[in-house]
């Protein structure tokens, strides 16, 4: 059974971080090796584990220097091989929710085509051999990581950097908005959430309530991103059985929903990113002294 994604307070920081990184890669390897009947659930588990692994790898960046990008890209490429079916499913779910809220006569045709595209994506089994090969590389990379003597300080620096960049993205989202800005912000939020989970309850800025709010913010931004994917897909809809009008209706509803989600995300962001970075770091001081 996989270990909890959490550092043991009695475990040295360095050993714990390395253990967790290797554990998440092992979870991903096991998840992509499941029988075909369990593939969808396995891919979901693998993608989540790889996201957590990439967050943990951030802590080791100062130790591995220029090789960080290669190691990160190995994890990212493995996840990318598993993304097609997930994105197709997300578009179907988003379109169905929009039509449930404000039905349109021709929406069923559009949703039906999206559903068939999702079925095709699932039928095209991902190259699990390639994914497994990438994960073996990632596993060897993780095993080679040194046990940093100042791992607590490195962890605080990594969490502080994800906060700093997330705060900049939040301010940019409030001022400009836009799909790319929100997508970048979501990535920073996820990194902060993952790193905070490792030390949940051990500082004021990694309390259970804040970790829960970060999870909620990530979900809001994730739903916004799924709608952005849907809007792009709807823009390519051919006029089959009069579906162009329905596709346009769904796209308009998606844009309206995206704006609402972005507003809610920015409001929650004000609570989670209101502190200046130096004040945030001060609240992590106790962790920096851990071995």
Segments from the language model and where they lie:
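Function-determining surface determinants
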Residues: 1-291
